[in-house]
Amino acid sequence: MDAPRRSSRLAAKIANVLDSKGTIIPEAAPVMLKKPAKDESVDSTIQVGDVIPDITLPDEDGTSIRLRDITANKGLVIFAYPKASTPGCTKQGCGFRDNYPKIQASDYEVLGLSFDTSKAQKAFKDKQNFPYHLLSDPKGELIKKLGAEKPGGGKLFRSHWIFEKGTGKCIVKEIDISPLVSVDKAFAVITDSEP
């Protein structure tokens, strides 16, 4: 009895094998599996309610700062700026500087973040007398996880995030925001006041 006719496309996908008696047996056609659906829970950017990434980055002096060590004991505001020592970034940084005593009184810490090197961060901090640390993230490890990297890479949206004391959960995520609005909104959340 003849084998059932198969299309040439399918026949090309079937390999022949020999059984123990040397008889040719067609091997079953490979099973075509659908690509698994993208798991939305594996989104690479942090969302409100997510825990702060367990990342350690150098500050302006090259000292390693582990984010979860801070949020274990204090709330945390991270503000991201495109480039150290530029006008908008200076406004944003100085706004957090000027409100820093009140932010600390509310049991929060502040960190600045950009792609800049530790050396550039040091010059920026010293020139503006910032009382908080500036994180250097030239590879964008944290910037990407926070969702602030612009399409094409290497640049970021001015942004800020607020993380809860103890749990490290993100309670505010503001991406692509103006310098002064960033400060006002973050300060309002921290101090439970109107922006």
UniProtKB/Swiss-Prot annotation:
InterPro entries reported for this sequence: AhpC/TSA, Peroxiredoxin_BCP/PrxQ, Thioredoxin-like_sf, Thioredoxin_domain
GO biological process: cell redox homeostasis; cellular detoxification of hydrogen peroxide; cellular response to oxidative stress; hydrogen peroxide catabolic process
Class in the EC hierarchy, top level: oxidoreductase
Main location: cytoplasm
Residues the record marks as active site: 89
Subunit structure: Monomer.
The name this protein goes by in its record: Peroxiredoxin bcp1
